[in-house]
UniProtKB/Swiss-Prot annotation:
Keyword Phosphoprotein: yes
Low complexity composition-biased segments: 359-377, 611-621
Top-level taxon of the source organism: Viruses
Source organism (scientific name): Human cytomegalovirus (strain AD169)
Compositionally biased spans, kind Basic and acidic residues: 180-191, 232-245, 258-272
Function: Promotes efficient viral DNA replication. Recruits the DNA polymerase processivity factor to pre-replication foci.
Organism classification: Viruses, Duplodnaviria, Heunggongvirae, Peploviricota, Herviviricetes
Stated name of the protein: Early phosphoprotein p84
Biased composition range(s): Basic residues: 326-335
GO cellular component: host cell nucleus; virion component
Name of the gene encoding the protein in the UniProt record: UL112/UL113
């Protein structure tokens, strides 16, 4: 026998709707409000229906979408509620929960409160029209009559709250119970999902209990599902929650996870005494027992349970142990302080005790210093602490000395020693900036080697002087053309040669300045060589050339008189007849054209050739005069050419890649300059 089914249909049509509010809180929460002039309602229950007209009023729609889509479904879960007023009174309030889809113009939700009940709510707002459609079907109660079903067909909510429920009809008890069951099923599914996704253990709180009215039931369900939807957010579900297990049964109250980490950390660094106990247990036992036998056990602090917590804890325990015997060895312990500076990477800063013997760094390592045994008795503990601190200071001193020897150059000379106070205050130990140490004011500075400190200071001074452009005071040899005497002799500047020789002799490279007499070099300087460099190098007789600029650009100037004299001196040794001076360039070009006769015989074209030669010589002389006038104007304005007029009339030449490029100083010359500079600093 088929059970009777009740179907409720409602169709709202609004005239002249105007949207006055549209607030989108986020991607899943949307509120829209409209005002209208008139409205018409078509209300149908099963086979009956009626029409209702309303005057001016407003409509408010709330759309909420939360959580993830259910398995096999393309829509997300949510709810939609619509409240309608007209003639100053509340006329309708609709609420449906289920799969929801909404956009700018259409919002629709389809829900099912159980296997025997389902509902549909749709709102369409486009082209100046606003329509709301609501359809719901459910099974009738056995005790419900047809009139009761008709009265219940005028229900206004999806939670089966009928209009007659306000009067206490029997059909009102069926709707809330089904809604409550549906809510409980959803909560159970949410709880299972939270457990599977490793969510928090106490996460799923039940929703509010549904009351007799539709507003109360919907409000409790709304709060429950909104919270469940927030927890079902995949971004929050993928995040690992912090587990907080109950504290262990031990008296320290620390969680078992931290206890296991502490035991693992302390087990890796075992001591060599105390009946097989590790160092951390002995230290904690000694501190807890007031310096006694160390039988009590004290756990690590909560803030030192990291992987390197044993470093900080060992250092603090050693400070506690040493402070317990402070009245016996106060005069020895006030200079050695062992602590960890705040903000460092966990390494121990071990200042060197004054008067400590520096040993080889290979004999003792910082890792072995941390695992030194400490006896349980008070007096023997103080002595062992003193021995371990002395070994630590010796190892640290050896490390510092090796670092300084690595930085100090082997060729630097020894500087006069300075006082220990000056070394402690001014000498940098490392190139990196060490973070400020809170124990620096109380801890004494370690003794340093005077020899290496002076070398470091000298090198630092040299680097600072290099930065300030006052590296050395060696004179630079000029690259200009040297003046020439009447006999073809080039005279070198005696003062510059003497200063250069004195500087090089001071550097220990060549002979002293007294062994260098005033130099006069007979001969000429070729046009393709650097003037003034080769004679100075030959006069000093050093394996390296005198200091010159790193790069120099030679001027585009040649000396034709010097070149002619060089050619004359070379030809005088081979033949008695001197060579004629070279013809001008224009005459040379015309001469080549004149020698190339076009006729076959020489006698027939003699006159023509002489006329051509005369005309060409006259025209070339006119052009050369104009060119010379232009050259004279350029030479008057060129200071470089005026300098070259001392040796004769100069002229410009074209650039040459072989002679006019950048000249690079040899590495040996740079080494000589550096050696002279270092020697000058040490002589000061």
């Amino acid at each position: 026998m088929d059970l009777p089914t009740t179907v409720v249909r409602k169709y709202w049509t609004f005239a002249n709707p105007n949207r006055i509010l549209h607030q989108s809180v986020n991607q899943t929460f949307d509120v829209r409000q409209f005002v209208f002039d008139t409205a018409r309602l078509v209300n149908c229950v099963d086979g009956d229906g009626k029409v209702l007209h309303l005057n001016k009023g407003w409509l408010c729609a709330t759309i909420m979408q939360h959580g993830e889509a259910s398995a096999g479904a393309k829509t997300q879960q949510g709810f939609m509620s619509i409240d309608i007023t007209g003639d100053g009174e509340l006329q309708e309030h609709l609420f449906v929960r289920g799969g929801i889809v909404f956009n700018k113009s259409v919002s629709s939700v389809v829900g099912s409160s159980g296997p025997n009940e389902s509902a549909l709510l749709t709102m369409i707002s486009e082209n100046g029209n606003l329509q709301v459609t609501y359809v719901r079907h459910y099974l009738k109660n056995h005790g419900e009559s047809s009139s009761g079903g008709g009265g219940c067909g005028a229900a206004s909510t999806a939670s089966a709250v009928c209009v007659s429920s306000l009067g206490g009809s029997g059909g009102t008890r069926d709707g809330p119970s089904a809604e409550e069951q549906q809510r409980r099923r959803q909560e159970q599914r949410h709880e299972e999902r939270r457990k599977k996704s490793s969510s928090s253990a106490g996460g799923g709180g039940g929703g509010g209990a549904g009351g007799g009215g539709g507003g109360g039931g919907s409000g409790g369900q709304h709060s429950s599902d909104s919270a469940n939807g927030l927890l079902r957010d995949p971004r929050l579900m993928n995040r690992q929650k912090e587990r907080r297990p109950p504290p262990s049964s031990e008296n320290d109250g620390s969680p078992p996870l931290r206890e296991a980490k502490r035991q693992k950390t302390t087990a890796q660094h075992e001591g060599h005494g105390g009946g097989g106990k590790n160092e951390t247990e002995q230290q904690s036992g000694g501190a807890g027992g007031g310096g006694g036998g160390g039988s009590g056990r004290m756990s690590l602090p909560l803030d030192t349970s990291e992987a390197v917590a044993f470093l900080n804890y060992s250092s603090s325990s050693s400070a506690v142990s040493s402070s317990s015997n402070n009245h016996h060895h106060h005069h020895h312990h006030h200079n050695a302080v062992t602590d960890v500076a705040a903000g460092t990477d966990g390494a121990l800063l071990l200042p060197i005790e004054r008067g400590a013997v520096v040993s080889s760094p290979s004999s003792t390592s910082p890792s072995s210093l941390l695992s030194l045994p400490r006896p349980s008795s008070a007096h023997s503990a103080g002595e062992t602490v003193q021995e371990s601190e002395a070994a630590a200071t010796a190892a640290a001193a050896g490390l510092m000395m090796m670092r300084r020897m690595r930085r100090a150059p082997a060729e630097a000379a020894e500087a006069p020693p300075q006082s220990e106070e000056e070394n402690d205050s001014t000498t940098p130990v490392s190139n990196c900036r060490v973070p400020p140490n809170s124990q620096e004011s109380a801890a004494p500075q370690p003794p340093r080697s005077p020899r290496f400190d002076d070398i470091i200071q000298s090198l630092t001074k040299m680097l600072n002087d290099c930065k300030e452009k006052r590296l050395c005071d060696l004179p630079l040899v000029s690259s200009r053309l040297l003046p020439e005497t009447s006999g073809g002799t080039v005279v070198v500047n005696h003062s510059s040669v003497a200063r250069t020789a004195a500087a090089v002799s001071a550097a220990g490279v060549g002979p002293p300045a007294a062994a260098c007499p005033p130099l006069v070099t007979t001969g000429v300087v070729p046009s393709g060589s650097v003037a003034g460099v080769a004679p100075v190098a030959a006069a000093i007789e050093t394996p390296a050339a005198p200091p010159r600029p790193v790069c120099e650009i030679k001027p585009y100037v040649v000396n034709p008189v010097v070149a002619t004299a060089a050619a004359a001196s070379n030809s005088s040794s081979s033949s008695s007849a001197p060579l004629p001076p070279p013809p001008p360039p224009s005459g040379g070009r015309r001469g080549r054209a004149r020698n190339n006769t076009r006729g076959g015989g020489g006698g027939g074209g003699g006159r023509n050739s002489r006329r051509q030669a005369a005309s060409s010589s006259s025209s070339s002389s006119r052009r050369s005069r104009r060119r010379n006038n232009r050259h004279e104007d350029e030479e008057d304005n060129d200071p470089l050419l005026r300098l070259s007029q001392v040796a004769g009339n100069g002229r410009r030449r074209g650039p040459s890649f072989l002679e006019d490029g950048l000249e690079i100083i040899d590495p040996s010359e740079e080494a000589a300059i550096a050696a002279a500079s270092i020697a000058a600093f040490f002589d000061d």
